[in-house]
């Protein structure tokens, strides 16, 4: 009888694993992402993507680059929270504390939406150029991007745009799509 326990135990784990995989893959929502986006903020990321009309993969990648998903993150220049809002920008877009993850992601969505509208006056050639301009405006400020007529020559901003784009196409690819 003792020899049967490993077999029954293995069978039980196989069944549990199969049921877990089936239930995990049955929901195509953003909250069923396979671990790239912290589960507790997946719906917030999906909402920010909807508000901003940008892909959820991009919103998630931006949060990763901004704060590495640390709601208590604070930059040397005073940006705070998951989406790293400067106090002046938080006053315009945020509600409550910048360190509140849900509020930070919600504000990110609205700010990205407004940045998208601002950079549209530069008449981007395509969706990718528009997205790059939005990211550059988030990093360097919309005034700089508009005055430069595009992505400024700041290495930090150029790296920022490239890093988010790459992460959105690799680590976060498909995290909120029907195929994931």
Where are these regions (language model features)?
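Cell-wall polysaccharide-cleaving catalytic domain and substrate-binding groove, primarily
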Residues: 45, 64-89, 141
